[in-house]
Amino acid sequence: MAAAVTWIPLLAGLLAGLRDTKAQQTTLHLLVGRVFVHPLEHATFLRLPEHVAVPPTVRLTYHAHLQGHPDLPRWLHYTQRSPYNPGFLYGSPTPEDRGYQVIEVTAYNRDSFDTTRQRLLLLIGDPEGPRLPYQAEFLVRSHDVEEVLPTTPANRFLTALGGLWEPGELQLLNITSALDRGGRVPLPIEGRKEGVYIKVGSATPFSTCLKMVASPDSYARCAQGQPPLLSCYDTLAPHFRVDWCNVSLVDKSVPEPLDEVPTPGDGILEHDPFFCPPTEATDRDFLTDALVTLLVPLLVALLLTLLLAYIMCFRREGRLKRDMATSDIQMFHHCSIHGNTEELRQMAASREVPRPLSTLPMFNVRTGERLPPRVDSAQMPLILDQH
């Protein structure tokens, strides 16, 4: 009975843990070529009651990845400023991403070490309505990417941009951090921001003001350090500080001509005036060339060998001829030198002079003995005792 009472709470806790690890699933509808922003709120993962607010000291971090893959798709990005702030999944799907994708999000509670999972089912379809062939991209240096992702600042940017564009519906196409486009991390100084690229599309043509800003003359002034050509009032200031030297306009109203598919040929340029076809090469016999290349050096080496042998064997001077060409006085002097040398060698070998006694080994000066002393010198001290 006591064992059953002990196991009941343990099984209840295990079942509760299994129930918590079950991932929630949320279905989201996306459009190709339109910006997608999904906030990762702390309240969604903490599962608090509606009337209970999220404590400001709760720290949550998120990890998102494509199901079956270690990372997110190429078009989708994740950002979170700190564990106290919510995270964001944002991006713009491409036509190749059409269909559905499953994103798994795991939230980690840095205080209680709890783990919560959520599954996002992204249904990506084609946009409805008119096309947006006129697209403009602006670099906003006064904001970070997570400051523009919420709905309120994004709508405020579109409203302010409407004063520079012709009347029409403006839609956000993409939002990209400047760090992802090669920007530098700003210094930790107040007022310094990373910057964000905002891409906007519309069905109405560009205004004269935007065309002048993106003209080559305006870019030339920016390259010289001068302000760009902005002929209208900047309605984006002071809420958004736009770098007007980094404005790009893309007009897709005129379809690009399709590249002609080259027709594969035989690879022979017959009608090219600069093409000189090679002539037919006749068959050649290289036996003669090979024999000349091998035999001529061998014959030359053989002739040189015979010439050297003749000179060394048959053209030598000889001792008799050399002695006959030498005078008698010189020959007598030479012979006397050899004779005296031999005589001195014989005298040195025949003399037997006794060696000095001091040079003999182990000679005793007091006794005159030539034999080694009876006392073993190895056992005698080097310095005798003095009395």
Curated annotation (Swiss-Prot):
Its main location: membrane. The modification Phosphoserine is found at S377. Glycans are attached at N174, N246. It holds the Pfam family Sarcoglycan_2_C. GO terms for cellular component: cell-cell junction; cytoplasm; cytoskeleton; dystroglycan complex; membrane raft; plasma membrane; sarcoglycan complex; sarcolemma. Residues 1-23 form the signal peptide. One of its GO terms (biological process) is membrane organization. Residues 24-293 are extracellular. Keywords: Cell membrane, Cytoplasm, Cytoskeleton, Glycoprotein, Membrane, Phosphoprotein, Signal, Transmembrane, Transmembrane helix. The chain crosses the membrane at residues 294-314. Striated muscle, both skeletal and cardiac. Residues 315-387 are cytoplasmic. GO terms for molecular function: calcium ion binding. Disulfide bonds: none annotated. It is found in: Cell membrane, Sarcolemma; Cytoplasm, Cytoskeleton. InterPro entries: Cadg, Cadherin-like_sf, Sarcoglycan_alpha/epsilon, Sarcoglycan_C, Sarcoglycan_N. Cross-link to form 2 major subcomplexes: one consisting of SGCB, SGCD and SGCG and the other consisting of SGCB and SGCD. The association between SGCB and SGCG is particularly strong while SGCA is loosely associated with the other sarcoglycans. Interacts with the syntrophin SNTA1. Belongs to the sarcoglycan alpha/epsilon family. Component of the sarcoglycan complex, a subcomplex of the dystrophin-glycoprotein complex which forms a link between the F-actin cytoskeleton and the extracellular matrix. This is Alpha-sarcoglycan. It comes from Mus musculus (Mouse).
